[in-house]
A protein has these predicted regions:
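Acidic, Mg2+-coordinating active-site environments of NTP-dependent enzymes
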Residues: 82-220
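Phosphate-binding loop of NTP-binding sites
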Residues: 1-117, 121, 131-135
């Protein structure tokens, strides 16, 4: 099972969190550090990928419109995560709107092969994401604190260095509560994106969430 992750920020942390969660379901191969290009991933795969790996989690960097499309042809992701669209690297892209076009190439590639993409509700401010969700509503899940999110972060409280988090799946009418140990308000969203994706990949992970979140590495 192949999972691609992109976004203006948060993708490395989400990658590590998701890999840790999926480990309870099977061996995970994921790109170390911030390796996110075809060349870097190719070298990494040749050095470390083994036949026994069940999951491949790939960080996918955008260096221009079309770069994630090329990465997607290489990785062939079954699932995808878009963490955010921000104004980093606008000098490279020309505008935030062009960044959104580039990042949306991942969910477009995923839904084209019948897969599922989990995206931050924040990116729905950009037309490419609204378009792909309108065309494939059953293959896109939005996550965030916003009322309109498909999976809403309903509760997040930090107690003694541990977040108590409740996610509300507004479409299914279900809730999931779990604990998460990484400090920083931004890691609430990072953990929510990883959790929703992990449940899409293997719903049984929900039964083991308290066990899989405590050993996640603190990523800057």
């Amino acid at each position: 099972v192949r999972i691609g992750i992109t976004g203006s920020f948060g993708k490395t942390t989400v990658k590590h969190i998701l890999a840790e969660m999926l480990e309870v379901s099977g061996p995970v191969f994921y790109s170390r550090g911030s390796i996110n290009t075809v060349l870097g991933l190719t070298r990494h795969i040749r050095q470390r990928l083994q036949w026994g790996h069940r999951y491949f989690v790939a960080e996918m960097g955008a260096y221009g419109i079309g770069s994630i499309r090329r990465l997607s042809r290489f990785v062939e992701p079954d699932f995808g995560i878009v963490t955010a669209v921000g104004d980093a690297h606008t000098e490279r892209f020309g505008s935030v709107e062009n960044i959104a076009i580039a990042k949306c190439e991942l969910p477009e590639a995923v839904v084209a092969k019948g897969g599922h993409a989990v995206i931050a509700q924040q990116v729905m401010a950009f037309e490419p994401f609204r378009r792909v969700k309108a065309a494939h509503p059953d293959h896109i899940t939005t996550v965030g604190r916003e009322e309109e999110a498909d999976v809403r972060i309903e509760h997040a409280e930090l107690t003694q260095g541990v977040w108590d988090i409740t996610l509300h799946d507004t479409r299914a009418g279900t809730r999931l509560s779990y604990q998460f140990p990484l400090l920083g308000e931004h890691n609430v969203m990072n953990s929510a994106l990883a959790t929703v994706m992990a449940l899409k990949v293997d719903p049984e992970i929900a039964q083991r969430l308290p066990l899989v979140t405590k050993d996640v590495e603190q990523i800057p």
